[in-house]
Each structure stands twice: as structure tokens, then as C-alpha cells.
Amino acid sequence: MSRARAVKKNSLVDAVVVPVGAVGRFGAFAALAGVAAMRLQWSVAEAIRHAGVLAMRCLIPVCATIFPFGAVIGVQGMAIFDLFGAHRLLSSLLSVVIIRELGPVLAAVLVAAQGGSSFAAELGAMRIKEELDATAVMAVDPVGWHVVPRVLAMVLVVPLLTILADAVGVFGGYVVAVGMYDQDHGVFMAHLVQLIGVYDLFASVTKGLVFGGLVGLIATYRGFHASGGAEGVGRAVNDTVVYSVMFILVVNYVLSSAMFGSGS
């Protein structure tokens, strides 16, 4: 009994200590990346190159995903609003749901799946091949040279894709409302801007910035600390996608509560 109790106690301790240690290591890694960025220990050309590749890889998936979301919201919204004779309010619903929430969240999730996994795989392969150690031996900061450009690429690309996702998602709803349900174009556009202002667009882009930094740090952290050969790289890629999606949703709730919780 005492041995079983000891095993149970150790398991409980591990369940608490291991996550806390992981959070601490991630925080230290993020701090190192921030210091390297402020000291300009990174290549602008590399950041731009990564941003270009990331944007091209994620452009079509973002558009192809957000458009049907907007269309589905349009179909369901018209079905509900028609019960009250208020179908003209569909564009107001679209603008709030997509611009405030779905646009930045879906853009970040797809970038995490497409670009974050790629960054984790690249850095994981470098770690396994000891290329990161070789960079340090050459008196070059591996965090500044390999991590910071990728994180900055995420911070740059996710807000841009968020703006695109907002526009494409609203257009998906427009196609349904005007093309399928014959809603007047002027009515749709008038109510589109009724509940959305500059603050909402700013909030959407701000979410994109935060999500981009979060995904970039998670992806580079998992890849940078990969171990165990090819299997370890695979785990790093899988963890990147899972943790990124999880924290995007949690942080989105926090940001939405802070930005819109007072009824703004």
C-alpha cells in the first residue's frame, strides 16, 4: 500500500511539476528571442524570405476555408432572420462574427498547420543534424539567426492574412445574401458597416499580431528543442499544431473579453 501511495504521489508531483517546467522553459526561450530581436541579431533578408514563402503557402488554404464559413453563416443567418423579417441584418452578423472572431482565428490556425509545422520540422531537422550547435560554434547566436526571422515572419504574415480572411469571409456571406436570396446590394452594404468600425478592424489585426507571435514562438520552440531523431521531429511538428490551436482559442477568448467584453 505504501509503495502504491508513493507511486501515486510521484505521478501527482510529475503532473504538476512537468507542465510548470515546460512553461518556464518556453518563457525563457521567448525572452531569448525577444532579446535577440531587440539587439538586431537577425537577418532582415531571412525574415522577408520566410514571410514570402509563408504567405504563398497559406494564401489559398485561408481563402478556401474562410469563404465557405462566410457562406454557411449567410445561409444559417438568413434562415433565422427570416423568422423575424430581419434578413437585412445578415451583413451586420457577418461583419461581427467574421471580422471580430473567425477571420483572425482561422487565419492563425491555418498558418499554424501549414507554416508552423514547417518551421518546427526545419528547426527540428537542424537540431538532429547538429546544425544549430554548429551555428553556435561559429559564434553566431542560433536563436537570433534561425528563430527570430521565423517568428517575425509569422508576426508579419498572420495579420495580413487576417485582413484577407475578413474580406473573403464577408464576401462569402455576400454571395449567399445577394446572389441566392436576392437581398439588395445597398441594404447589405449599409448594414455591413453598422456595427463595425475602425476599432473592430484594429482589434482583428491586433489579434493577428498576437496569434502570429504565439504560433511563431511555439513552432520554433518545439523545433529548436526537438530530440530523438526523426521520431522527435515528428513529435515536434505534431505538438506545434496541437498547442498552437489550443492556445489560439484560449488567447482569443481572453482578447475578445478584453476588447469587446464591455459591449463595445
Could you tell me what each predicted segment is?
Residues S2-A47, R222-S227:
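Short, membrane-interfacial amphipathic segments enriched in basic
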Residues A55, L59, C63, L102, ...:
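Selective transmembrane-helix segments that form parts of the transport pathway or gating/packing helices
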Residues C63-A71, A125, V155, P159, ...:
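Generic alpha-helical transmembrane segments of integral inner-membrane proteins
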Residues L123-V148, A230-V233:
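Short cytoplasmic-facing helical segments at TM-TM junctions of multi-pass membrane proteins
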Residues V233, D239-S256:
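Final/C-terminal transmembrane alpha-helix of multipass membrane proteins
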